[in-house]
Amino acid sequence: MTRQAPDPRITERRNPRTANIDLASAIEIVDLMNAEDRTVADAVATQREEIAHVVSLTEDAFRRDGRLFYVGAGTSGRLGILDASECPPTFGSEPEMVQGIIAGGFPAILRAQEGAEDSPAGGAAVMDEHDVGERDVVVGIAASGTTPFVHGALQRARARGARTAIVACTPLSEKLLAMVDVAIIAVVGPEVVTGSTRLKAGTATKMVLNMITTGAMIRIGKTYGNLMVDLKATNEKLKDRSERIVAEVCGIPRDEARTLLSAAGMRVKTAIVMYKLSVDRAGAEEALAAAGGTIRRVVTDAPPPVPT
């Protein structure tokens, strides 16, 4: 029997540690998957400098009123949409600031759209539709690094002057590397189920995206210490969190924090500055605007210590 050469894409190779997983019990399957997943964080850590570079590019884009776009297909596209959709409630950002684009459009979020990922022209067109330009950052997401839709988007984004990056889980071709300013390549190895990149590759990708958006948002002043001071209180849980943050930072009872938040238009940052500087809402908003929205430049006190 002729022996086939291994697929150059590590994400498509068979995992020798799970070759007989179909004979495993439920607990054995869980243990095998858990053992594989423990390697993911280490793979991501090898890319710390590249991830930090993209954080800095994104910070610069945000400071120039630019945007961050994630572009992917299938699981990769969905992960981009997931990360983008969490930014407004977490950091009080406008929905346009971080956007996730998936090959096949909205229907592809719930159901695979056959052939959509195979069109580089489709990726290029979506960059034109969003008028991507020099103030923007475009991050392609492709576990195997071979998605034509992503390649097309990156090429067009670069031609339009945007900064570009790719998140992948297998070594990339020189041609693809030439399309991007930064390549984040978290090699997690073959999947538990061959080619199922929703597993380790998906986990690694989500970790990287978390770092990009969270890092950039922190850098532009969206937190005070590790407190979420720019959140939008869109539900009861977030209203409760807003009250707890104001009460903790200002050292006041919850009912007083609630009243202060109401006077501040439910903006945590504004409420804290109103209390700390003994000013009204307009005065707090003016002070924050002068400080570029960074609360540390207005309130010189360190955040309260973490309760033990």
Sequence positions of predicted segments:
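Cofactor-/ligand-binding subdomain signature composed of acidic, glycine-rich
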Residues: 1-43, 47
